[in-house]
Design a protein with these regions (language model features):
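Enzymes that bind and transform nitrogen-containing heteroaromatic metabolites
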Residues: 1-242
Length: 242
């Protein structure tokens, strides 16, 4: 039987995270992780500048209180030449939408959207330019990520930068929605059983864990930048995701 390749009608999603040498994205207190170098911050900004939207969870917003804007002149010019807004859309992802309404994020000059559930949509509507609802049929308190990404794609958001935290990244890996992964390995050891990692959630059994292809290894000073592509079978008419 002939199979026909199909296009994934979801955005291209790239996870960008910095972690300690032992694989922690924050310490055990979940304090804001500021151990990345100035080079890492420039790298993060460059990745964000390529995106139509930036996604992050409520925990990340609680920890940092702000988001990273595109500020470098060459990156702003590049977006302008591509006909894009100067700043990508900043999308907070939270099923409950219990956020700190006083966070500095809400006064930053960036477009703000909320991705949530029916219950979460009742909160802070006046703080966001757009509120998207994508609710899991199995659990109304959780986001249906496949539906959410289809909505984002329909709104012409074709490239996403995923900035964490680990629960959000785990949900997107579980839904097979991550395409690329950038990890900055930083020269410190954090340890701690309760310290968060790049991918949290319930985890994957080794036999069905997402597989990666290493695209690039880039040392810079005492850090190492790792770039991976997520391996997946070509989407065809015979294996299209439900």
């Amino acid at each position: 039987m002939q199979v026909t390749p199909l296009l994934r009608k979801v955005p291209h999603a790239t996870v960008i995270l910095a972690m300690s040498a032992d694989g922690k994205i924050a310490d055990a207190t979940r304090a804001p992780a500021r151990f990345g170098s100035a080079i890492d911050k420039l790298h993060l900004e460059a990745q964000i500048s390529q995106a139509d939207a930036v996604l992050f969870g409520a925990g990340t917003l609680w920890a940092y209180g702000t988001t990273l804007k595109v500020t470098q002149a060459d990156l702003l010019n590049q977006r302008q030449q591509q006909g894009k807004p100067l700043q990508p859309v900043q999308i907070v992802c939270s099923g409950s939408a219990k956020l700190d309404a006083e966070a500095r994020f809400f006064s930053q000059p960036v477009p703000r959207w909320l991705l949530t559930t029916t219950i979460g949509a009742c909160w802070h509507r006046d703080k966001f330019e757009r509120v998207l609802v994508a609710e899991s049929k199995e659990d109304a308190s959780k986001i249906n990520w496949q539906e959410a990404f289809e909505q984002l794609y329909a709104l012409s958001l074709e490239r996403l930068a995923i900035l964490g935290g680990g629960e959000l990244v785990a949900s997107l890996f579980a839904a097979d929605l991550v395409d690329e992964l950038w990890l900055t390995v930083c020269p410190l050891i954090l340890g701690g059983a309760m310290a968060p990692t790049p991918v949290e959630g319930v985890g994957f059994l080794a036999g069905v864990a997402p597989r990666l292809e290493l695209l690039d290894v880039r040392p810079a000073d005492e850090e190492v930048f790792l770039h991976y592509r997520v391996k997946r079978k070509p989407l065809t008419a015979t294996n299209e995701r439900e």
